[in-house]
Amino acid sequence: MKKIVFLIGILASCISYAQNFSYPMASPRQVITQQFSVSQVTVDYGRPSVRGRKIFGELVPYGKVWRAGANQATSISFLQPVKVGGKPVKKGDYAIFITPEQHQWKIVLNYDTDAWGAYSYDPNENAIEFTVPVIQTKDLQESLEFSFESLSNEKLNLIIRWEYTKVEIPIEIDKKETIDKIIEQLKEVKQFERDLEGKDN
């Protein structure tokens, strides 16, 4: 009886310990967020790795829609109106789908953010689409990587790197006059807060 109680105790301890961990994923999820203009941009994606394979043109075929990552489709979120690839996009959440070719990629922002991979991709749900040139790199990027570069108050580039391939997706603010008004209002609020602090002192 004591042995049974002991074994149950050990099992309970193991279960409790295991709840603090998760099984290592082949394509772990990553979320990146960049403060931009008066809000922020967030990308949520799975990170597959090369692992000695030929990626573009083989694992990811040319001319076919790709989920831009692994597992659930990659998503991007905007908290203000922007232009992506020169095209206006309302604030909200979008799935990113890509049709890669050797020298250029077609980038699509799609309304179906719950899609698992590209299996249920519906072009009727597209918000915008545009093409960007492919840049070949010398250094191997082992795991798929999204990042933000060339950041200013009005523009930034979303960078996608994998294997020996890189693309740059330009993002800029839309409705500049509205954004300028928001900035002025924020400045007024900050000044009001400083004035209050001065009175308290």
Walk through the language-model features, giving the residues of each.
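Aromatic- and Gly/Pro-rich amphipathic surface segment
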Residues: 57-73
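Bacterial Sec-dependent N-terminal signal peptides
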Residues: 1-21
